[in-house]
């Protein structure tokens, strides 16, 4: 489906389109509109939900970042990679792809390490790439890891 909006107070955060001469014809995937003291987000879901897997990683990462805003952790990865966060400061990252993938787990700067629950290995953080924003952005850390096809890793974060 296509979301049509006839207002200038809504902004396309993620859009899809096809290149044209001198520009792009955009179709909103994720819209943001200021509402009261917050923001209202509208995420366009394709008629065939399986098409969500076709979104590029950059679009998925932006959707994940915004939808995880109230959490202290989010995932940057291609499609078919899941992040499962639990209330005891543990998480599982699972790769549902048929090939290996590289992922980044982005956390608040208070998270200083990830401990692999299977083998005890410690992942040290790297400074996350800054997000462009007009508002002050909280400092973030990122943890890079590789996942084999159809595998998962469990971590405790501290």
Model-derived regions, located:
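A conserved amphipathic helix/loop scaffold
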Residues: 1-158
């Amino acid at each position: 489906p296509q979301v049509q909006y006839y207002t200038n107070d809504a902004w396309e955060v993620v859009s899809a389109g096809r290149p044209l001469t001198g520009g792009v014809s955009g179709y909103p995937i994720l819209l943001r509109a200021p509402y009261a003291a917050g923001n209202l987000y509208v995420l366009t879901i394709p008629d065939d939900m399986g098409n969500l897997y076709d979104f590029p990683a950059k679009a998925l990462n932006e959707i994940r970042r915004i939808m995880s805003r109230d959490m202290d952790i989010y995932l940057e990865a291609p499609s078919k990679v899941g992040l499962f966060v639990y209330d005891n400061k543990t998480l599982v990252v699972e790769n549902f792809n048929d090939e290996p993938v590289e992922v980044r787990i982005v956390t608040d700067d208070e998270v200083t390490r990830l401990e692999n629950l299977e083998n005890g290995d410690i992942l040290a953080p790297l400074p996350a790439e800054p997000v462009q924003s007009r508002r002050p952005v909280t400092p973030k850390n990122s943890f890079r890891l590789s996942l084999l096809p159809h595998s998962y890793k469990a971590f405790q974060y501290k």
